[in-house]
From Swiss-Prot:
Source species of the chain: Frankia alni (strain DSM 45986 / CECT 9034 / ACN14a)
Keywords: Ribonucleoprotein, Ribosomal protein, RNA-binding, rRNA-binding
Transmembrane portions of the chain: none
Function text: Binds as a heterodimer with protein bS6 to the central domain of the 16S rRNA, where it helps stabilize the platform of the 30S subunit.
GO process terms (BP): translation
A GO cellular component entry from the record: cytosolic small ribosomal subunit
Similarity field: Belongs to the bacterial ribosomal protein bS18 family.
Keyword Ribosomal protein: yes
Family annotation (Gene3D superfamilies): Ribosomal protein S18
Pfam families, alphabetized: Ribosomal_S18
Name of the protein in its database record: Small ribosomal subunit protein bS18A
Amino acid sequence: MPTRRTPKPGQRKKPNILRERGITYVDYKDVALLRQFISDRGKIRARRITGLTPRQHREVTRAIKNAREMALLPYPGPAAARGR
Protein backbone atom coordinates (compact mmCIF):
# COMPACT_ATOMS: atom_id res chain seq x y z
CA MET A 1 0.00 0.00 0.00
CA PRO A 2 1.53 3.36 -0.98
CA THR A 3 2.20 5.83 1.77
CA ARG A 4 0.76 9.32 1.84
CA ARG A 5 3.00 12.19 0.99
CA THR A 6 3.75 14.46 3.87
CA PRO A 7 3.98 18.16 3.12
CA LYS A 8 7.46 19.62 3.08
CA PRO A 9 8.39 22.01 5.87
CA GLY A 10 7.27 25.52 5.04
CA GLN A 11 4.66 24.28 2.56
CA ARG A 12 1.01 24.96 3.23
CA LYS A 13 -2.27 24.48 1.45
CA LYS A 14 -3.35 27.05 -1.08
CA PRO A 15 -6.16 29.31 0.13
CA ASN A 16 -9.57 28.44 -1.29
CA ILE A 17 -10.84 31.74 -2.73
CA LEU A 18 -14.45 30.58 -3.03
CA ARG A 19 -14.62 29.32 0.56
CA GLU A 20 -12.97 32.49 1.92
CA ARG A 21 -15.57 34.68 0.21
CA GLY A 22 -18.49 32.39 1.05
CA ILE A 23 -19.38 31.82 -2.62
CA THR A 24 -21.56 28.76 -3.17
CA TYR A 25 -22.64 29.39 -6.78
CA VAL A 26 -20.18 30.40 -9.50
CA ASP A 27 -21.89 32.64 -12.05
CA TYR A 28 -20.51 32.87 -15.59
CA LYS A 29 -21.28 36.61 -15.61
CA ASP A 30 -18.93 37.29 -12.68
CA VAL A 31 -15.92 37.92 -14.93
CA ALA A 32 -13.79 39.48 -12.18
CA LEU A 33 -13.97 36.26 -10.14
CA LEU A 34 -13.41 33.97 -13.13
CA ARG A 35 -10.31 35.89 -14.27
CA GLN A 36 -8.56 34.76 -11.08
CA PHE A 37 -8.75 31.17 -12.35
CA ILE A 38 -7.37 31.93 -15.83
CA SER A 39 -3.71 32.35 -16.75
CA ASP A 40 -2.41 35.35 -18.69
CA ARG A 41 -2.59 33.18 -21.82
CA GLY A 42 -6.28 32.41 -21.27
CA LYS A 43 -5.91 28.86 -19.97
CA ILE A 44 -7.79 27.50 -16.96
CA ARG A 45 -5.46 27.07 -13.98
CA ALA A 46 -5.10 23.62 -12.38
CA ARG A 47 -6.64 22.66 -9.04
CA ARG A 48 -3.26 22.35 -7.39
CA ILE A 49 -2.57 25.98 -8.30
CA THR A 50 -5.96 27.42 -7.31
CA GLY A 51 -6.59 25.31 -4.20
CA LEU A 52 -10.19 24.51 -5.17
CA THR A 53 -12.03 21.30 -4.36
CA PRO A 54 -12.83 18.98 -7.31
CA ARG A 55 -16.47 20.04 -7.30
CA GLN A 56 -15.62 23.74 -7.17
CA HIS A 57 -13.11 23.30 -9.98
CA ARG A 58 -15.77 21.67 -12.18
CA GLU A 59 -18.17 24.55 -11.46
CA VAL A 60 -15.52 27.18 -12.21
CA THR A 61 -14.52 25.36 -15.41
CA ARG A 62 -18.13 25.19 -16.57
CA ALA A 63 -18.63 28.90 -15.79
CA ILE A 64 -15.45 29.86 -17.67
CA LYS A 65 -16.52 27.85 -20.71
CA ASN A 66 -19.96 29.47 -20.66
CA ALA A 67 -18.38 32.93 -20.34
CA ARG A 68 -16.15 32.16 -23.32
CA GLU A 69 -19.19 31.20 -25.39
CA MET A 70 -20.80 34.52 -24.47
CA ALA A 71 -17.55 36.36 -25.44
CA LEU A 72 -16.96 37.60 -21.88
CA LEU A 73 -13.61 35.79 -21.55
CA PRO A 74 -10.93 34.97 -24.15
CA TYR A 75 -10.28 31.56 -25.62
CA PRO A 76 -6.72 30.28 -25.50
CA GLY A 77 -5.50 30.07 -29.05
CA PRO A 78 -2.40 29.62 -31.13
CA ALA A 79 -1.90 33.39 -31.36
CA ALA A 80 -2.08 33.77 -27.58
CA ALA A 81 0.32 30.88 -27.08
CA ARG A 82 2.89 32.34 -29.48
CA GLY A 83 2.63 35.86 -28.09
CA ARG A 84 1.14 37.52 -31.18
